[in-house]
Design a protein with these regions (language model features):
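Trp/Phe/Arg-rich N-terminal binding region typifying the photolyase-homology
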Residues: 1-160, 264
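Intrinsically disordered, low-complexity regulatory segments enriched
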Residues: 14, 59, 135-138, 198, ...
């Protein structure tokens, strides 16, 4: 008899290894792995067509890793999660934190509702070496400039947590009554332009680790020099492997950031500053949400027309 079901809400963390939310959920009797395509809260920040295609492939890869047990939904996560915990013997809901302002506002509301329903709710750090509130200047204010943030903040901060492995044992459930298929989310392009991209990428957790190893062996040693020489082959290697591939895999969470960062920090201090750019973005946006469309420095008050 099912008495203890934990929901693991996948968002930007479509992997099994080094996934704190999944590891915590796996401590319960049963795990209900869930993905919700949020059509209510993103507003103008809905992913574009290429991102949707990548998401489509990532969801299929994740579902395969879970033995076909991923329950997929579309709509307002607040309503969907409330419905799930009412219909099933759910005792806990776990997720890894997202740091977009709209995501944080949504998650706070959802956590409040679920707690009022008597559900244990835990959010975890599954994407950053340090939380936004952990790296601050001596006066307690957040950093605005990357170099001091990295040199004084990151390099003097407490060591990041050790990476987690995949849960060794999980009893997975599926919400067969109301779940959708990945294909039903209508994420694939209406025209088959994705066929020209697909041969060049292996999407999913396995492909992300392959891309990381490729960067370490073929791009890392040349990154400091190659990133500044756009006319040279080194630049193309570094950009394709490090910038384009890693940013997409980080976005869908197939490449676990704490694990990859720790590995790369050991290998090369020169490139470790570069791989911290995504961290400073996630740290500054929650503090200054206006950075999405407005400068943080008052020395340059003009509108950012290039974003319009």
């Amino acid at each position: 008899m099912m008495e203890d079901v934990a929901v693991c809400w996948f968002r930007q963390d479509m992997r099994l290894s080094d996934n704190p939310a999944l590891s915590a959920a796996a401590e319960h009797q049963y795990v209900l792995p869930v993905y919700i395509l949020d059509t209510k809260n993103p507003g103008t920040f809905v992913p574009g067509a290429a991102s949707q295609w990548w998401l489509y492939c990532s969801l299929h890869a994740l579902n395969q890793s879970l033995g076909g047990k991923l329950s997929v939904y579309e709509g307002d996560p607040k309503q969907i999660l409330a419905d799930i915990v009412q219909r099933l013997p759910v005792t806990a809901v776990h997720w890894n934190r997202c740091y977009e302002p709209w995501s944080m506002e949504r998650d706070t509301k959802i956590k409040t509702i679920l707690l009022q329903m008597g559900i244990q709710v835990e959010s975890h750090n599954g994407s950053l070496l340090w939380e936004p509130w952990d790296i601050k200047k001596a006066d307690g204010t957040p950093y605005r400039v990357f170099t001091p943030f990295y040199r004084k903040g990151c390099l003097n901060a407490a060591a990041p947590r050790k990476p987690l492995g995949s849960p060794k044992e999980m009893s997975l459930l599926q919400d067969e009554d109301k779940m959708l298929s990945v294909d039903a989310l209508d994420l694939k392009p209406k025209f088959n332009w994705d066929e020209t991209l697909a041969p060049h990428w292996t999407i999913g957790e396995e492909g992300a680790h392959h891309r990381l190893e490729e960067f370490i062996h073929n791009g890392l040693a040349h990154y400091k020099e190659g990133r500044n020489l756009p006319a040279k082959p080194l630049y193309l290697v570094c950009r394709r492997i490090f910038v384009l591939g890693k940013s997409l895999q980080i976005r869908c969470g197939t490449l676990q950031r704490p694990r990859e960062m720790a590995k790369t920090l050991i290998i090369s201090a020169a490139s470790s500053a570069g791989v911290n750019f995504p961290i400073v973005c996630c740290i500054t946006i929650p503090i200054w949400p206006q950075l999405i469309c407005k400068r943080s420095l008052t020395d340059f008050p003009g509108p950012m027309t290039w974003l319009l």
